Amino acid sequence: MTNESNTPLPPLALSVRQPWAWAIIHGGKTIENRTLGAIRTGNMDCRTICIHAATGMREKEYRWAVWKLQSIDVALPPPADLIRGGIIGTVDVVDIVIEKTCPESHKPWFGGPYGLLLENPKPLEPIPAVGELGYFKWEAAVAFKPPASWMSRYVPKMEGNGTLGLFDDLPIAFETPPEKPFGTSKRSKK
């Protein structure tokens, strides 16, 4: 498989949930957070890889990402516009970092405990592909995942902490962040 300039694409890809895959290629996201176990079992190392936009994305994840990215001046496209189930670009993995070795300029993206340090994102004309865990050899597929019904009718919920509808040309603003849709284990809820 080649890109528009007939350069061969990297044979390995990393599947990343949207909207974070978009943020890597278009939004300046320079760290892809992973556990050490995921890095080891996924055979992740430093090389140029394709970024695969995974098929999964829930409304709570998207809403939280809107808030998170807005806090660092990155505006997300509407959820229905995000490719899911395909290769969307390439990036160089240049290091594997922990918090104390993560360069200060990359800290807004670091959520730990480990991260792949990314450079040189290059968007591609999207190519449908099925994702896997870790680095995987990708092959072109037949079609992208169509938008879920919530994505096509998405209007951010106010829940008392957002301002919407009055000035549609302004970005969504939150006084407080939406509930974080991940990161709490069942054990911590006891």
Feature names for model-found ranges:
Residues 2-190:
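Structured alpha/beta reader/binder surfaces that contact nucleic acids or chromatin modification marks
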